[in-house]
């Protein structure tokens, strides 16, 4: 996966920098680019489309097909990015480009995505407390993605891109079992 990230990063950075530059005149430019790249990434991630890219020897055909499928979803600059990526035989990394682009947007907006897995559904107060604690620790706004996993027994697991906090009973029991061995 790190190879894909390495390949995708320059495309994502260029698209992000261009979107930020455009946002001086169009406040929704970053959101538009997020939508364009998200749609193109979904198309490129389709199994039939990936097979087509793998078996197409013409760069022009691959680019034209992708632009045609995406249609009105891409503006002229989005189409230029698709054509450049096709020319470099990188259309298959569009999903990774989208992921990297989203990371740049999160950094730019000073937000972080935090996954919270709990044994029981969290109420609004608990979510607010976790969000406040994570905002303080990360020094940025957080977006919580909460889910329930009954196998935790009790407690929560909090995950970000940088670290994991395992405050679950299952995690504590596993650590205790490892210490006793």
Curated annotation (Swiss-Prot):
GO terms for molecular function: proton-transporting ATP synthase activity, rotational mechanism. F-type ATPases have 2 components, F(1) - the catalytic core - and F(0) - the membrane proton channel. F(1) has five subunits: alpha(3), beta(3), gamma(1), delta(1), epsilon(1). F(0) has three main subunits: a(1), b(2) and c(10-14). The alpha and beta chains form an alternating ring which encloses part of the gamma chain. F(1) is attached to F(0) by a central stalk formed by the gamma and epsilon chains, while a peripheral stalk is formed by the delta and b chains. This is ATP synthase subunit delta. The keyword RNA-binding does not apply. Pfam families: OSCP. It is found in: Cell inner membrane. GO terms for cellular component: plasma membrane; proton-transporting ATP synthase complex. Transmembrane segments: none annotated. Belongs to the ATPase delta chain family. F(1)F(0) ATP synthase produces ATP from ADP in the presence of a proton or sodium gradient. F-type ATPases consist of two structural domains, F(1) containing the extramembraneous catalytic core and F(0) containing the membrane proton channel, linked together by a central stalk and a peripheral stalk. During catalysis, ATP synthesis in the catalytic domain of F(1) is coupled via a rotary mechanism of the central stalk subunits to proton translocation. This protein is part of the stalk that links CF(0) to CF(1). It either transmits conformational changes from CF(0) to CF(1) or is implicated in proton conduction. It is a peripheral membrane protein. The keyword Transport applies. InterPro entries: ATP_synth_OSCP/delta_N_sf (IPR026015), ATPase_OSCP/dsu (IPR000711). Keywords: ATP synthesis, Cell inner membrane, Cell membrane, CF(1), Hydrogen ion transport, Ion transport, Membrane, Transport. Gene3D superfamilies: N-terminal domain of the delta subunit of the F1F0-ATP synthase.
């Amino acid at each position: 996966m790190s190879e894909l990230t390495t390949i995708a990063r320059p495309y994502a950075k260029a698209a992000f920098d261009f979107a930020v530059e455009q946002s001086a005149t169009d406040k929704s430019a970053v959101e538009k680019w997020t939508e364009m790249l998200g749609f193109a990434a979904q198309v490129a991630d389709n199994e039939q489309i990936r097979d087509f890219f793998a078996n197409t020897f013409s760069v022009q055909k691959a680019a034209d097909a992708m632009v045609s499928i995406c249609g009105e979803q891409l503006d002229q600059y989005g189409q230029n990015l698709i054509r450049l990526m096709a020319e470099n035989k990188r259309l298959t990394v569009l999903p990774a480009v989208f992921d990297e682009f989203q990371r740049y947007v999160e950094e730019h907006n000073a937000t972080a995505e935090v996954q919270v897995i709990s044994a029981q559904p969290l109420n609004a107060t608990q979510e607010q407390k976790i969000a406040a604690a994570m905002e303080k620790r990360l020094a940025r706004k957080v977006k919580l993605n909460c889910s329930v996993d009954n196998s935790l027994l009790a407690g929560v697991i909090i995950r970000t891109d940088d670290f994991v906090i395992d405050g679950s009973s299952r995690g504590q029991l596993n650590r205790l079992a490892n210490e006793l061995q």
